[in-house]
Amino acid sequence: MHLLPELASHHAVSIPELLVSRDERQARQHVWLKRHPVPLVSFTVVAPGPIKDSEVTRRIFNHGVTALRALAAKQGWQIQEQAALVSASGPEGMLSIAAPARDLKLATIELEHSHPLGRLWDIDVLTPEGEILSRRDYSLPPRRCLLCEQSAAVCARGKTHQLTDLLNRMEALLNDVDACNVN
């Protein structure tokens, strides 16, 4: 289920392409939920800027896939099906996991908080009925900015930071993880 970093497209995605890609992801999620009546983990990489598919995002994605598989194994949860693909919005993974949806969401939240790359992962858990379990459902604050600890949404809307600074921080986090062999 890993993606080859050297095959990244480096395509600068437009807003309309991004919106179509998100609609297509939602349609794929519904197909998966019909095929597997268990919770679905939908996993993407948080990538600022217009280039969503790069060597860096694919390497970050691959670490996330490894961490999600390890989480399922540790908890004794069966992965019924898994797939990876690349869309206009970057690397995407889907894993149908036989586990209680709320427990799965809590475990993925903990993974996002505990793993050094967790802030670069967007891990959604959908119930078998298609409901997305949100951070708000667990009274958690919004995602923090990579650079200043403010709300990431506020910094993104206000263009508080230079794109190069955000991308450099992403790459530094990835290089630290690779240097320490963290999965």
Curated annotation (Swiss-Prot):
A GO biological-process term: prosthetic group biosynthetic process
Catalytic reaction annotation: apo-[citrate lyase ACP] + 2'-(5''-triphospho-alpha-D-ribosyl)-3'-dephospho-CoA = holo-[citrate lyase ACP] + diphosphate
Induction per the UniProt record: Repressed by H-NS. Part of the citCDEFXG operon.
Pfam families (alphabetical): CitX (PF03802)
Entry EC no(s): 2.7.7.61
InterPro entries: CitX (IPR005551)
Assigned protein family: Belongs to the CitX family.
NCBIfam families cross-referenced by the UniProt entry: citrate_citX, PRK01392.1
Function: Transfers 2-(5''-triphosphoribosyl)-3'-dephosphocoenzyme-A on a serine residue to the apo-acyl carrier protein (gamma chain) of the citrate lyase to yield holo-acyl carrier protein.
HAMAP family: CitX
Name this protein carries in UniProt: Apo-citrate lyase phosphoribosyl-dephospho-CoA transferase
Species: Escherichia coli (strain K12)
